[in-house]
Design a protein with these regions (language model features):
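Structural signature of hydrophobic alpha-helical transmembrane segments
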Residues: 40-45, 95-107
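Loop-to-helix transition at the N-terminal end of transmembrane alpha-helices
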Residues: 63-79, 100-101
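Membrane-interface helix-boundary motifs at transmembrane edges
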Residues: 59-68, 119-126
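N-terminal signal-anchor/start-transfer transmembrane helix
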Residues: 43-60
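Membrane-helix boundary connector in multi-pass membrane proteins
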Residues: 91-95, 113-128, 145-149
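Final/C-terminal transmembrane alpha-helix of multipass membrane proteins
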Residues: 130-147
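Cytoplasmic-side transmembrane-helix entry/capping segments in multi-pass membrane proteins
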Residues: 67-73, 125-134
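Hydrophobic transmembrane alpha-helical segments in integral membrane proteins
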Residues: 24-48
Length: 149
């Protein structure tokens, strides 16, 4: 019967040795890029849903309520967050997006700002305004995705 040599006691790997042994955590730019990609997809879908819900709420009074505005705000904030993450990728990590991808992000910020500015002048038709804005943002997002894919 042969004896197996005893295993060495496990030791914690110092941070500096982690990369040498292949145990490196993903780089922050990889995490930001994946976040930008997936939040972008979610924001496109969320703005499409929010746009349709707002248009239905404009026509059907029963549908109006706080939940419509919460959905709309969450959808728009997702897009704004996605634009900020994309801006961080370009500014800090020198990512070069193709075509006019960055222009679509700029348009998202402008559109959300203009919609917020015009909400007072659209009293009684605010759901219509935000429904059209949600669908427009969805279209911008789809165009931005097709610039990359």
């Amino acid at each position: 019967m042969t004896r197996h040599p005893s295993r060495p006691t496990p030791q914690t790997i110092p941070r500096s040795d982690a990369a040498a042994r292949g145990l490196e955590e993903p780089a922050i730019e990889t995490v930001l890029f994946d976040t930008h990609k997936w939040v972008g997809f979610v924001a496109v879908v969320a703005n499409g849903i929010a746009g349709i819900v707002c248009l239905v709420a404009w026509r059907v009074v029963r549908w109006r309520g706080r939940w419509v505005w919460i959905l709309t705000i969450v959808a728009e904030v997702l897009f704004l967050f996605d634009v900020v993450v994309g801006t961080a990728l370009v500014a800090a990590y020198k990512f070069k997006p193709p075509g006019i991808h960055m222009f679509y992000g700029f348009l998202v910020f402008i559109t959300v700002g203009l919609a917020f500015q015009y909400r007072e002048s659209m009293r009684g038709r605010t759901e219509l305004l935000y429904g059209l804005v949600g669908l427009f943002l969805m279209g911008l997002g789809i165009r931005a995705v097709f610039q990359v894919v």
